[in-house]
């Protein structure tokens, strides 16, 4: 998985295509990511200590990694992700501009 928590991504397919957000959670086993404010669903919540009223809450649902692309830190356009070894460390790079994503 080439995505990490905190990466800025753009949704390329689906009902939220074109929207941008930050990754809040990475689900490696399912190849999915949770993006802040994207792919919102309504969940019926039973009453509990945290929410004694219960009811319907809005929540972000995971989206498959094939439907999102990382935003290039320089150009702010969608780009693919590559990797290079610099100073003995593996670093993610943006394919379009060649700049390092991990600082």
From Swiss-Prot:
| Disulfide pattern | none
Gene3D superfamilies this protein is in? Answer: 2.30.30.30
Sample GO molecular function, one term: rRNA binding
Domain of life where this protein originates? Bacteria
Look up keyword rRNA-binding and say if it applies: yes
Q: Name one GO biological process term.
A: translation
Recorded hits in CDD domains, A to Z, give: KOW_RPL26
Q: Which PROSITE patterns match?
A: RIBOSOMAL_L24 (PS01108)
Gene Ontology cellular-component terms for this entry are:
ribonucleoprotein complex; ribosome
The UniProt keyword set, sorted, is: Ribonucleoprotein, Ribosomal protein, RNA-binding, rRNA-binding
Which Pfam families does the UniProt record give?
KOW (PF00467), ribosomal_L24 (PF17136)
Per the record's keyword annotation, is rRNA-binding included, yes or no?
Answer: yes
Q: Main role?
A: One of two assembly initiator proteins, it binds directly to the 5'-end of the 23S rRNA, where it nucleates assembly of the 50S subunit. One of the proteins that surrounds the polypeptide exit tunnel on the outside of the subunit.
Family of this protein: Belongs to the universal ribosomal protein uL24 family.
> Matching HAMAP family, A to Z?
Ribosomal_uL24_B
User: What does the record note on quaternary structure?
Assistant: Part of the 50S ribosomal subunit.
**Alphabetized NCBIfam families for the sequence:** rplX_bact (TIGR01079)
Show the PANTHER family listed in the entry.
MITOCHONDRIAL RIBOSOMAL PROTEIN L24 (PTHR12903)
Its protein name is Large ribosomal subunit protein uL24
The organism named in the record is Lacticaseibacillus paracasei (strain ATCC 334 / BCRC 17002 / CCUG 31169 / CIP 107868 / KCTC 3260 / NRRL B-441) (Lactobacillus paracasei)
